[in-house]
Amino acid sequence: MTFENTLHFAQQLDRNDPLRSFRDRFLIPQAGGKELIYFCGNSLGLQPKAAREALDRELTVWQHLAVEGWFMRPDQAEDTPWLSIHKRCKDPLAQIVGALPSEVVPMNNLTVNMHLMLTSFYRPAGQRTKILTIGGDFPSDQYALETHIQARGMNPADVLVEIFPREGESAWRGEDICNAIDTHRDTLALVLMSGLHYYTGQVFDMAAIARKALQAGVPVGFDLAHAIGNIPLWLHDWQVDFAFWCSYKYLNSGPGGVSGVFIHQKHHNANLPRLAGWWGYDEDSRFAMTKGFVPMAGADGWQLSTPTVLAMAVHHAALQITAEAGMDALRRKSEQLTAYLEFVLRNSGYPLEIMTPADPAGRGCQLSLLVHQDGKRLFNRLVEQGIIGDWREPDCIRLAPTPLYNTFEEVWHVGQILLKFRT
Protein backbone atom coordinates (compact mmCIF):
# COMPACT_ATOMS: atom_id res chain seq x y z
CA MET A 1 0.00 0.00 0.00
CA THR A 2 1.17 3.52 -0.81
CA PHE A 3 0.63 5.74 2.22
CA GLU A 4 -0.42 9.39 2.15
CA ASN A 5 0.34 11.85 4.91
CA THR A 6 -3.15 13.36 5.02
CA LEU A 7 -6.00 13.34 7.51
CA HIS A 8 -8.40 12.13 4.82
CA PHE A 9 -6.20 9.11 4.06
CA ALA A 10 -5.89 8.19 7.76
CA GLN A 11 -9.64 8.49 8.26
CA GLN A 12 -10.25 6.31 5.21
CA LEU A 13 -8.02 3.62 6.70
CA ASP A 14 -10.06 3.81 9.90
CA ARG A 15 -13.34 3.52 8.01
CA ASN A 16 -12.04 0.39 6.28
CA ASP A 17 -10.72 -1.15 9.51
CA PRO A 18 -12.64 -4.38 10.31
CA LEU A 19 -11.54 -4.08 13.97
CA ARG A 20 -12.63 -0.47 14.47
CA SER A 21 -15.54 -1.38 16.78
CA PHE A 22 -13.18 -2.90 19.37
CA ARG A 23 -12.02 0.57 20.43
CA ASP A 24 -15.46 1.12 21.93
CA ARG A 25 -14.81 -1.69 24.40
CA PHE A 26 -12.04 0.24 26.13
CA LEU A 27 -11.89 3.28 28.39
CA ILE A 28 -9.65 5.83 26.69
CA PRO A 29 -7.81 8.14 29.14
CA GLN A 30 -8.70 11.81 28.89
CA ALA A 31 -7.20 15.15 29.86
CA GLY A 32 -9.17 18.37 29.77
CA GLY A 33 -12.16 16.55 28.35
CA LYS A 34 -10.17 15.30 25.34
CA GLU A 35 -9.10 11.74 24.65
CA LEU A 36 -5.36 11.16 24.89
CA ILE A 37 -3.43 9.41 22.14
CA TYR A 38 -2.35 6.36 24.11
CA PHE A 39 0.59 4.57 22.48
CA CYS A 40 1.74 2.82 25.66
CA GLY A 41 0.02 -0.56 25.48
CA ASN A 42 3.48 -2.12 25.51
CA SER A 43 3.76 -0.98 29.13
CA LEU A 44 0.16 -1.10 30.39
CA GLY A 45 -2.86 -1.89 28.26
CA LEU A 46 -6.05 0.11 28.61
CA GLN A 47 -8.96 -0.91 30.81
CA PRO A 48 -11.66 -2.94 29.08
CA LYS A 49 -15.15 -1.72 29.90
CA ALA A 50 -15.98 -5.33 30.75
CA ALA A 51 -13.42 -5.33 33.59
CA ARG A 52 -15.63 -3.52 36.09
CA GLU A 53 -18.60 -5.77 35.32
CA ALA A 54 -16.42 -8.86 35.77
CA LEU A 55 -15.19 -7.56 39.12
CA ASP A 56 -18.70 -6.70 40.25
CA ARG A 57 -19.89 -10.24 39.50
CA GLU A 58 -17.25 -11.77 41.75
CA LEU A 59 -17.78 -9.17 44.46
CA THR A 60 -21.47 -10.06 44.40
CA VAL A 61 -20.62 -13.74 44.80
CA TRP A 62 -18.36 -12.86 47.74
CA GLN A 63 -21.11 -10.72 49.24
CA HIS A 64 -23.86 -13.33 49.03
CA LEU A 65 -22.03 -16.66 49.22
CA ALA A 66 -18.77 -15.86 51.02
CA VAL A 67 -16.74 -19.09 51.29
CA GLU A 68 -19.36 -21.05 49.34
CA GLY A 69 -18.30 -19.05 46.28
CA TRP A 70 -15.49 -21.54 45.89
CA PHE A 71 -18.03 -24.26 45.14
CA MET A 72 -21.17 -22.66 43.67
CA ARG A 73 -22.50 -19.72 41.69
CA PRO A 74 -25.62 -17.72 42.53
CA ASP A 75 -28.71 -18.63 40.52
CA GLN A 76 -26.79 -21.33 38.63
CA ALA A 77 -24.74 -18.75 36.72
CA GLU A 78 -22.78 -20.16 33.80
CA ASP A 79 -19.36 -19.09 35.14
CA THR A 80 -17.39 -21.77 36.95
CA PRO A 81 -17.05 -21.37 40.74
CA TRP A 82 -13.82 -19.99 42.11
CA LEU A 83 -12.42 -23.49 42.63
CA SER A 84 -12.00 -23.77 38.86
CA ILE A 85 -11.76 -20.10 37.93
CA HIS A 86 -8.46 -20.62 36.11
CA LYS A 87 -10.26 -22.90 33.65
CA ARG A 88 -12.27 -19.96 32.31
CA CYS A 89 -9.05 -18.57 30.85
CA LYS A 90 -7.58 -21.72 29.31
CA ASP A 91 -9.40 -21.76 25.96
CA PRO A 92 -8.74 -18.11 25.03
CA LEU A 93 -5.13 -18.37 26.24
CA ALA A 94 -4.59 -21.49 24.16
CA GLN A 95 -6.00 -19.71 21.12
CA ILE A 96 -3.77 -16.67 21.62
CA VAL A 97 -0.49 -18.59 22.08
CA GLY A 98 -1.17 -21.47 19.69
CA ALA A 99 -1.42 -24.22 22.27
CA LEU A 100 -3.66 -26.96 23.59
CA PRO A 101 -5.80 -25.89 26.56
CA SER A 102 -3.99 -28.47 28.69
CA GLU A 103 -0.67 -26.74 27.93
CA VAL A 104 -1.54 -23.35 29.45
CA VAL A 105 -2.53 -22.10 32.86
CA PRO A 106 -2.89 -18.56 34.27
CA MET A 107 -1.08 -18.12 37.57
CA ASN A 108 1.29 -15.97 39.63
CA ASN A 109 3.38 -13.17 38.12
CA LEU A 110 6.01 -13.38 35.41
CA THR A 111 9.27 -13.62 37.35
CA VAL A 112 7.78 -16.12 39.80
CA ASN A 113 6.81 -18.27 36.84
CA MET A 114 10.27 -17.86 35.33
CA HIS A 115 11.82 -19.30 38.50
CA LEU A 116 9.30 -22.16 38.46
CA MET A 117 10.15 -23.00 34.86
CA LEU A 118 13.88 -22.83 35.57
CA THR A 119 13.37 -25.29 38.41
CA SER A 120 11.77 -27.77 36.03
CA PHE A 121 13.71 -27.24 32.81
CA TYR A 122 17.22 -26.18 33.83
CA ARG A 123 18.76 -29.53 34.68
CA PRO A 124 22.55 -29.23 34.46
CA ALA A 125 24.36 -32.54 34.13
CA GLY A 126 27.96 -33.35 33.31
CA GLN A 127 29.41 -30.76 30.96
CA ARG A 128 25.92 -29.53 29.99
CA THR A 129 25.56 -26.68 32.46
CA LYS A 130 25.28 -23.52 30.38
CA ILE A 131 22.24 -21.35 29.60
CA LEU A 132 22.17 -19.48 26.29
CA THR A 133 20.34 -16.16 26.39
CA ILE A 134 20.50 -12.72 24.81
CA GLY A 135 22.58 -9.96 26.36
CA GLY A 136 20.58 -6.96 27.46
CA ASP A 137 17.33 -8.81 28.04
CA PHE A 138 14.75 -7.32 30.40
CA PRO A 139 16.44 -6.72 33.78
CA SER A 140 14.07 -8.92 35.80
CA ASP A 141 14.98 -11.84 33.54
CA GLN A 142 18.67 -11.13 34.04
CA TYR A 143 18.24 -10.98 37.83
CA ALA A 144 16.19 -14.18 37.86
CA LEU A 145 18.81 -16.06 35.85
CA GLU A 146 21.70 -14.81 37.94
CA THR A 147 20.11 -15.55 41.31
CA HIS A 148 18.66 -18.89 40.22
CA ILE A 149 22.10 -20.01 39.08
CA GLN A 150 23.62 -18.81 42.35
CA ALA A 151 20.94 -20.70 44.30
CA ARG A 152 22.14 -23.84 42.53
CA GLY A 153 25.65 -23.17 43.87
CA MET A 154 27.10 -22.04 40.54
CA ASN A 155 28.65 -18.85 39.18
CA PRO A 156 26.54 -16.98 36.58
CA ALA A 157 29.74 -15.96 34.77
CA ASP A 158 30.50 -19.65 34.19
CA VAL A 159 26.96 -20.57 33.16
CA LEU A 160 25.50 -17.78 31.02
CA VAL A 161 26.25 -17.56 27.30
CA GLU A 162 24.99 -14.13 26.23
CA ILE A 163 24.47 -13.26 22.57
CA PHE A 164 24.65 -9.58 21.60
CA PRO A 165 23.99 -7.72 18.34
CA ARG A 166 27.01 -7.26 16.12
CA GLU A 167 29.16 -4.18 16.50
CA GLY A 168 27.33 -1.13 15.17
CA GLU A 169 23.97 -2.93 14.94
CA SER A 170 20.97 -2.64 17.24
CA ALA A 171 19.19 -5.85 16.20
CA TRP A 172 20.25 -9.44 16.76
CA ARG A 173 20.79 -11.61 13.71
CA GLY A 174 18.86 -14.85 13.86
CA GLU A 175 21.75 -16.80 12.40
CA ASP A 176 24.02 -15.60 15.22
CA ILE A 177 21.67 -17.05 17.83
CA CYS A 178 21.25 -20.34 15.95
CA ASN A 179 24.99 -20.60 15.28
CA ALA A 180 25.67 -20.05 18.98
CA ILE A 181 23.38 -22.98 19.81
CA ASP A 182 25.42 -25.11 17.42
CA THR A 183 28.72 -23.85 18.80
CA HIS A 184 27.80 -24.56 22.43
CA ARG A 185 25.54 -27.56 21.87
CA ASP A 186 27.73 -29.93 23.90
CA THR A 187 27.71 -27.66 26.96
CA LEU A 188 24.19 -26.21 26.82
CA ALA A 189 21.54 -27.24 29.33
CA LEU A 190 18.96 -24.63 28.30
CA VAL A 191 18.09 -21.88 25.82
CA LEU A 192 16.02 -19.14 27.47
CA MET A 193 15.32 -15.67 26.07
CA SER A 194 12.63 -13.16 25.22
CA GLY A 195 10.52 -13.78 22.16
CA LEU A 196 10.24 -10.05 21.49
CA HIS A 197 12.75 -7.58 22.89
CA TYR A 198 11.33 -4.99 25.27
CA TYR A 199 13.73 -2.17 24.30
CA THR A 200 14.23 -2.51 20.55
CA GLY A 201 10.86 -4.04 19.68
CA GLN A 202 12.57 -6.80 17.69
CA VAL A 203 10.71 -10.08 17.13
CA PHE A 204 12.96 -13.13 17.33
CA ASP A 205 12.42 -16.11 15.05
CA MET A 206 11.20 -18.38 17.81
CA ALA A 207 10.36 -21.20 15.41
CA ALA A 208 13.92 -21.32 14.04
CA ILE A 209 15.47 -21.04 17.51
CA ALA A 210 13.24 -23.81 18.87
CA ARG A 211 14.04 -25.99 15.87
CA LYS A 212 17.78 -25.50 16.34
CA ALA A 213 17.55 -26.20 20.08
CA LEU A 214 15.57 -29.37 19.42
CA GLN A 215 18.26 -30.55 16.98
CA ALA A 216 20.85 -29.92 19.69
CA GLY A 217 18.83 -31.79 22.30
CA VAL A 218 18.47 -28.66 24.44
CA PRO A 219 15.18 -27.49 26.00
CA VAL A 220 14.06 -24.01 24.96
CA GLY A 221 11.83 -21.47 26.70
CA PHE A 222 10.67 -17.94 25.95
CA ASP A 223 9.62 -14.89 27.93
CA LEU A 224 6.59 -13.67 25.97
CA ALA A 225 5.86 -10.51 27.96
CA HIS A 226 6.02 -8.32 24.84
CA ALA A 227 4.89 -11.00 22.38
CA ILE A 228 1.62 -12.36 23.76
CA GLY A 229 -1.34 -10.50 22.30
CA ASN A 230 1.06 -8.63 20.01
CA ILE A 231 2.08 -11.24 17.44
CA PRO A 232 0.64 -14.64 16.48
CA LEU A 233 2.27 -17.56 18.28
CA TRP A 234 2.22 -21.30 17.60
CA LEU A 235 4.04 -22.61 20.64
CA HIS A 236 2.78 -26.19 20.34
CA ASP A 237 3.68 -26.55 16.68
CA TRP A 238 7.05 -24.88 17.20
CA GLN A 239 7.89 -27.53 19.83
CA VAL A 240 8.73 -24.85 22.40
CA ASP A 241 9.27 -26.59 25.73
CA PHE A 242 7.91 -23.83 27.95
CA ALA A 243 7.03 -20.16 28.01
CA PHE A 244 5.76 -17.55 30.44
CA TRP A 245 4.30 -14.07 30.13
CA CYS A 246 2.53 -11.18 31.80
CA SER A 247 -0.99 -10.06 30.94
CA TYR A 248 -1.02 -6.33 31.65
CA LYS A 249 0.45 -5.19 28.32
CA TYR A 250 -1.27 -6.31 25.12
CA LEU A 251 -3.72 -8.58 26.96
CA ASN A 252 -5.12 -5.59 28.92
CA SER A 253 -5.67 -7.50 32.17
CA GLY A 254 -4.77 -4.63 34.48
CA PRO A 255 -1.70 -3.49 36.44
CA GLY A 256 0.08 -6.48 37.91
CA GLY A 257 -2.44 -8.79 36.23
CA VAL A 258 -2.23 -12.57 36.29
CA SER A 259 0.72 -14.14 34.50
CA GLY A 260 0.66 -17.54 32.85
CA VAL A 261 2.76 -20.42 31.58
CA PHE A 262 2.88 -22.79 28.63
CA ILE A 263 4.30 -26.29 29.10
CA HIS A 264 4.38 -28.47 26.00
CA GLN A 265 2.27 -31.60 26.02
CA LYS A 266 5.37 -33.76 25.57
CA HIS A 267 6.38 -32.93 29.16
CA HIS A 268 3.04 -33.60 30.84
CA ASN A 269 3.85 -37.18 31.78
CA ALA A 270 7.51 -36.53 32.52
CA ASN A 271 8.71 -36.74 36.08
CA LEU A 272 10.13 -33.23 36.04
CA PRO A 273 11.41 -31.56 39.20
CA ARG A 274 9.11 -28.79 40.32
CA LEU A 275 8.23 -26.52 43.20
CA ALA A 276 4.72 -27.55 44.17
CA GLY A 277 1.78 -26.14 46.09
CA TRP A 278 -1.67 -27.32 47.00
CA TRP A 279 -3.43 -25.67 44.06
CA GLY A 280 -1.46 -27.85 41.68
CA TYR A 281 -2.57 -30.98 43.52
CA ASP A 282 -5.09 -33.29 41.84
CA GLU A 283 -8.35 -31.37 42.26
CA ASP A 284 -10.46 -34.47 42.84
CA SER A 285 -8.60 -35.24 46.06
CA ARG A 286 -7.09 -31.86 46.98
CA PHE A 287 -9.20 -31.45 50.09
CA ALA A 288 -8.32 -34.89 51.41
CA MET A 289 -5.14 -33.14 52.60
CA THR A 290 -3.02 -36.28 52.26
CA LYS A 291 0.75 -36.45 52.31
CA GLY A 292 2.66 -36.65 49.02
CA PHE A 293 2.14 -34.44 45.97
CA VAL A 294 -0.07 -35.73 43.14
CA PRO A 295 -0.14 -33.12 40.36
CA MET A 296 -3.09 -32.15 38.23
CA ALA A 297 -2.77 -33.12 34.59
CA GLY A 298 -0.96 -30.81 32.21
CA ALA A 299 0.24 -27.31 32.99
CA ASP A 300 -2.32 -27.03 35.82
CA GLY A 301 -0.03 -29.19 37.94
CA TRP A 302 2.48 -26.32 38.19
CA GLN A 303 0.04 -24.09 40.09
CA LEU A 304 1.11 -23.21 43.61
CA SER A 305 -1.36 -21.16 45.59
CA THR A 306 -5.00 -20.21 45.74
CA PRO A 307 -5.77 -18.07 42.66
CA THR A 308 -6.37 -14.32 42.93
CA VAL A 309 -10.05 -14.44 42.03
CA LEU A 310 -10.61 -10.74 41.34
CA ALA A 311 -7.56 -10.45 39.10
CA MET A 312 -8.50 -13.68 37.34
CA ALA A 313 -11.99 -12.34 36.61
CA VAL A 314 -10.57 -9.24 34.90
CA HIS A 315 -8.06 -11.42 33.06
CA HIS A 316 -10.84 -13.58 31.64
CA ALA A 317 -12.86 -10.56 30.52
CA ALA A 318 -9.84 -9.11 28.73
CA LEU A 319 -8.81 -12.40 27.13
CA GLN A 320 -12.24 -12.81 25.58
CA ILE A 321 -11.78 -9.54 23.68
CA THR A 322 -8.42 -10.55 22.21
CA ALA A 323 -9.66 -14.02 21.34
CA GLU A 324 -12.75 -12.61 19.65
CA ALA A 325 -10.70 -10.21 17.54
CA GLY A 326 -8.31 -13.02 16.59
CA MET A 327 -4.55 -12.80 16.45
CA ASP A 328 -4.36 -12.99 12.65
CA ALA A 329 -6.68 -10.00 12.24
CA LEU A 330 -4.91 -8.08 14.98
CA ARG A 331 -1.56 -8.76 13.36
CA ARG A 332 -2.76 -7.56 9.94
CA LYS A 333 -3.94 -4.27 11.40
CA SER A 334 -0.86 -3.94 13.60
CA GLU A 335 1.54 -4.28 10.69
CA GLN A 336 -0.33 -1.58 8.78
CA LEU A 337 -0.69 0.70 11.81
CA THR A 338 3.00 0.52 12.71
CA ALA A 339 4.06 0.92 9.08
CA TYR A 340 1.94 4.06 8.90
CA LEU A 341 3.55 5.35 12.10
CA GLU A 342 6.99 4.77 10.58
CA PHE A 343 5.85 6.62 7.44
CA VAL A 344 4.58 9.72 9.27
CA LEU A 345 7.63 9.81 11.55
CA ARG A 346 9.98 9.85 8.58
CA ASN A 347 7.80 12.41 6.80
CA SER A 348 7.99 14.71 9.80
CA GLY A 349 11.69 15.26 9.20
CA TYR A 350 12.33 15.21 12.94
CA PRO A 351 15.92 14.12 13.74
CA LEU A 352 15.39 10.69 15.23
CA GLU A 353 16.55 7.15 14.53
CA ILE A 354 14.18 4.18 14.44
CA MET A 355 16.10 1.29 15.97
CA THR A 356 13.29 -1.26 15.54
CA PRO A 357 13.72 -3.52 12.48
CA ALA A 358 12.09 -2.15 9.33
CA ASP A 359 10.90 -5.58 8.21
CA PRO A 360 7.30 -6.01 9.48
CA ALA A 361 8.04 -9.68 10.22
CA GLY A 362 10.86 -8.58 12.52
CA ARG A 363 8.83 -6.32 14.78
CA GLY A 364 5.58 -6.11 16.69
CA CYS A 365 3.55 -2.94 17.06
CA GLN A 366 6.28 -1.00 18.91
CA LEU A 367 8.72 1.43 17.35
CA SER A 368 11.72 2.43 19.46
CA LEU A 369 12.96 5.91 18.61
CA LEU A 370 16.45 7.08 19.48
CA VAL A 371 16.54 10.85 19.98
CA HIS A 372 20.17 11.77 20.53
CA GLN A 373 19.59 15.44 21.35
CA ASP A 374 17.07 16.51 24.01
CA GLY A 375 15.19 13.21 23.85
CA LYS A 376 13.59 13.61 27.28
CA ARG A 377 12.49 17.12 26.35
CA LEU A 378 10.80 15.78 23.22
CA PHE A 379 9.10 13.08 25.25
CA ASN A 380 7.78 15.64 27.73
CA ARG A 381 6.52 17.85 24.90
CA LEU A 382 4.66 14.89 23.41
CA VAL A 383 3.00 14.25 26.77
CA GLU A 384 1.99 17.92 26.94
CA GLN A 385 0.31 17.43 23.55
CA GLY A 386 -1.65 14.44 24.83
CA ILE A 387 0.55 11.70 23.35
CA ILE A 388 1.36 8.99 25.88
CA GLY A 389 4.38 6.88 25.01
CA ASP A 390 7.16 5.44 27.11
CA TRP A 391 10.60 6.82 27.97
CA ARG A 392 13.61 4.54 28.40
CA GLU A 393 17.02 5.79 29.42
CA PRO A 394 19.22 7.08 28.02
CA ASP A 395 17.58 8.38 24.83
CA CYS A 396 14.73 6.11 23.73
CA ILE A 397 11.04 6.85 23.20
CA ARG A 398 8.88 3.78 22.67
CA LEU A 399 5.60 4.24 20.78
CA ALA A 400 3.28 1.26 20.42
CA PRO A 401 0.03 1.81 18.48
CA THR A 402 -2.16 -1.09 19.57
CA PRO A 403 -4.65 -2.55 17.07
CA LEU A 404 -7.45 -3.19 19.56
CA TYR A 405 -7.95 0.48 20.40
CA ASN A 406 -5.64 2.80 18.43
CA THR A 407 -6.49 4.45 15.12
CA PHE A 408 -4.74 5.59 11.98
CA GLU A 409 -5.98 9.12 12.62
CA GLU A 410 -4.13 9.10 15.95
CA VAL A 411 -0.97 8.03 14.14
CA TRP A 412 -1.38 10.88 11.65
CA HIS A 413 -1.74 13.40 14.49
CA VAL A 414 1.54 12.21 16.03
CA GLY A 415 3.30 12.98 12.76
CA GLN A 416 1.70 16.42 12.59
CA ILE A 417 2.81 17.27 16.11
CA LEU A 418 6.39 16.24 15.33
CA LEU A 419 6.24 18.32 12.16
CA LYS A 420 5.13 21.30 14.24
CA PHE A 421 7.98 20.73 16.70
CA ARG A 422 10.51 20.64 13.86
CA THR A 423 9.33 23.94 12.41
Predicted regions and their residues:
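Pyridoxal 5′-phosphate
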Residues: 1-423
